[in-house]
Amino acid sequence: MYAKGMITSDIEAHIQELYGLSVSDSTVSRVTDKILPVVKEWQQRPLESVYAVVFLDAIHFHVRSEGQIVKKAVYIAIGIQMDGIRDVLGMWVGENGSAKFWLSILNGLRNRGVQDILIACVGGLTGLTNAIEAVYPRTEIQQCIIHQIRNTARFV
């Protein structure tokens, strides 16, 4: 919440509303001061050079922002290493994805060491396929089977 621009008193009120817990501004400040460097380090950590599969998708949430309920998306990249170990490569909060957005995400993965992705499993998000083809041109792109079933069911 702090990283997204909420001030400590807003976070305090949010925690009170959601969980019924009372925390002071100073407690929120101390927690964020300790957590932010750890989160930043995780977001910038080096990644494997090759992933067998990378899943790219979004989860949509309704959240309260400035007194209104708005829809936000958390975009996520989960990789499966060549030895089968799963790894959350990153999570990004946004309102809508675009080719430019996905290019920045994929270039960020490349800058963190990902040189090749064998298969990208995607959920049909706007601009994602074009961004993958631009950054990782040899990657096979496979639409997620769940998304295929949902899309097909609309026509049955």
Task: Specify the residue positions occupied by each region the protein language model found.
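Short, surface-exposed amphipathic charged segments that create phosphate/polyanion-binding patches used
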Residues: 70-71, 154-156
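Inter-helix linker motif
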Residues: 136-154
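RNase H-like nuclease fold core
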Residues: 14, 18-126, 130, 134-138
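Conserved pre-catalytic core of RNA-dependent polymerases
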Residues: 1-2
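Short, charged amphipathic recognition helices of the HTH superfamily
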Residues: 5-15
